[in-house]
Every structure is written in C-alpha cells, then in structure tokens.
A protein has these predicted regions:
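N-terminal juxtadomain amphipathic helix
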Residues: 71-73
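Exposed, interaction-prone extracellular/peripheral surfaces
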Residues: 2-51, 59, 64-69, 78, ...
Length: 315
C-alpha cells in the first residue's frame, strides 16, 4: 500500500503516474466544490434548481399530497389504488457516492505538451477524489481498457482516496497498455449504469476516441438516476499540426502523416474538430456537465474553474 507524503507537489516526469504526485494534490483541492443539489422534498431547496441532484436520496414513505409538493414526486401507484393524491417523501443520504470512470485505453498514452494524456487523466481523477473526501462523500472508481476493467467500491475519508490513487497508479502505466484501438465507451457505460447507486455523481474521464453509436442509450439511462460530468482529455497535436512529416503508430502498424500541403492539414484539423465536438454535444444533449483538459493544463485549476460554472448553472 502507499502512504501519505508531503503536501509539496513533486515534479513528475509526465510519463508515469506517481503516487507521491497524486497524494500531494490534496493540499490544492480544499476549495473545490463538487456539484450538489438538494432533494426535491428538502425544505432547503431553492427556487432555482441546479442541474445536479447532489447527494442521493432514499425513499422514505408515501403521504397525502399537500399544496406546494413537487408534482414530480407524485406516487401514482398509491394515488390510483386509494383514489387520493399521494406524494413520495425521501430521506437524504449522509454521504454521496462519487464514481470516477477512467478510460485507460492505448490512445491515452500520448502527449506532446508537458505530460501524457494518461498522466493528466490520473491527476484529474485524484483531484476529484480529494474534492469528494473534503465534502465528506464516498469516492470510488471504475477503470477500463480493452478487454478488462476494475471496480473500486466507493469508500469515505482518506481510505477511499488512497484506494482510488492506488488503482490509478496500478492502471495508468505505459508498460501496462495493450496494443490496438480504444475500448468502446458504451461497454463501460453499460457496466457502470448497472452498478452505480442512484443519486451518485459520475465523472467520466476519457479522450472519447472510444465513442460509439451505443453511448447515447447508455448515457441517457445513466443520467436518469445519477449526475454525470464528462471530462475530455486532449493533446493539441490531435486537432492541429504544423506542416511536416510525422511518423505515427498505433502499436501494431506504422505510417507517416504528411501535413505539408494545406489540404491535408485542413482534413486533419477537420477530423480533430469533430473529435472535439461530438462527445461534448452528446453530453450536453443529456444535460450533463462537461469540461476539457489539455495535457499542458493544470488539472486542479481546470476542475476548479469548471466546477464553479457547473455548480451555479440552473437547469
């Protein structure tokens, strides 16, 4: 097991995910505020509802409808059986499960600016973990790669954060990657939506090269009972390249990408732009949060900035 280290952020090599580096992020995450929404039956619920549910809620009982009750909480079965309008009453959980879904596909092991995408993804995941611990929530993980996955059950406090960090260190190493393309994201989403507790906050960290036609259905169903944020990890070279000849490989085959002509650069940039826009449009269509992390960005700064927007945004 790994233990706590100094809060002074160590300098990593940008290639390997370091436990010391992820642990040190804790000192910078104390001000991060994960999205929260009071349950509809709460007396503290305001007039402007955030898009996020916040902590999960458990069904407590049904009672006679009272003026001012939220119609979305009507218990139609009891209403039909008794002939009198009834509404559901919920009890808020003390701890909200926060699940980091992390893509460890081969396409993550790429980077031309400061760090690999895999390292940036690991740092973002750790920052989310520390923010959850700070709020008193439980943090867990679901990591996936071609043909394999690992689940880390949500746990509270330092124990939960350290279990997540241990998983990140184990999974996000260049020598562990498999060859070939990315794992279909829909495969991971299907597994997650069958295991995540209602009311959870699910943060999906990926480059979204594994996006496929089935993601729409699984994301839609996941969003019914959980709050979802997508985080796309990017490298500048994936959507824009200067003129030149670039040897590239997917681990199995190699070729040369020639961007010496304007037409070829335009095609490359057009493909890169589609890759930027398609996952963002999908997540926004389902009213999910969205943020983008470049390999030369500071993950804690990006998370803090985007969370301030997400927390204050009404439905």
């Amino acid at each position: 097991m790994i233990g706590l280290a100094s809060s002074r952020p160590p300098e990593g090599d940008g290639i390997h995910v370091s436990a010391e580096e992820l642990i040190a992020l804790r000192a910078r995450c104390h001000a991060l505020r994960l999205p929260m929404r009071q349950p509809a039956a709460s007396a503290l619920a305001g007039a402007n509802r955030s898009r996020f549910r916040g902590r999960g809620v458990d069904f407590l009982e049904s009672r006679n409808y009272q003026p001012g009750d939220d119609i979305r909480n009507m218990d139609w079965r009891v209403t039909a059986r008794t002939g009198k309008p009834h509404t559901k009453v919920f009890q808020e959980e003390r701890e909200r499960p926060v699940l980091v879904v992390l893509d460890a596909s081969p396409t993550l092991y790429f980077g031309t600016r400061k760090r690999l995408k895999s390292v940036a993804a690991g740092q973002m995941a750790a920052a989310v973990g520390w923010a959850a611990v700070r709020r008193g929530d439980r943090i867990g993980g679901f990591m996936f790669a071609p043909g394999q996955h690992r689940e880390i059950r949500p746990a509270g406090g330092r124990r939960g954060a350290m279990r997540l960090i241990q998983g990140l260190v184990d999974w996000l190493q260049p020598d562990r990657q498999t060859s070939g393309g990315p794992e279909p994201l829909s495969t991971a989403l299907e597994r997650v939506r069958h295991t995540v507790r209602p009311g959870s906050l699910v943060i999906i960290i990926s480059d979204f090269f594994g996006l496929d036609e089935h993601c729409h259905r699984h994301l839609s169903r996941l969003r019914l009972h959980s709050d979802v944020i997508g985080c796309q990890v990017l490298d500048a070279a994936e959507h824009s390249l200067p003129a030149g000849r670039y040897p590239i490989t997917d681990g199995d085959q190699a070729t040369v990408l020639d961007t010496g002509h304007g037409a070829s650069r335009n095609r490359y940039e057009s493909m890169g732009q589609r890759h930027l826009e398609e996952p963002r449009r999908l997540f926004q269509k389902h009213d999910c949060g969205w943020l983008a992390l470049n390999t030369d960005d500071d993950p804690v700064d990006v998370l803090g900035r985007e969370l301030r927007v997400l927390v204050g945004r009404p439905v």
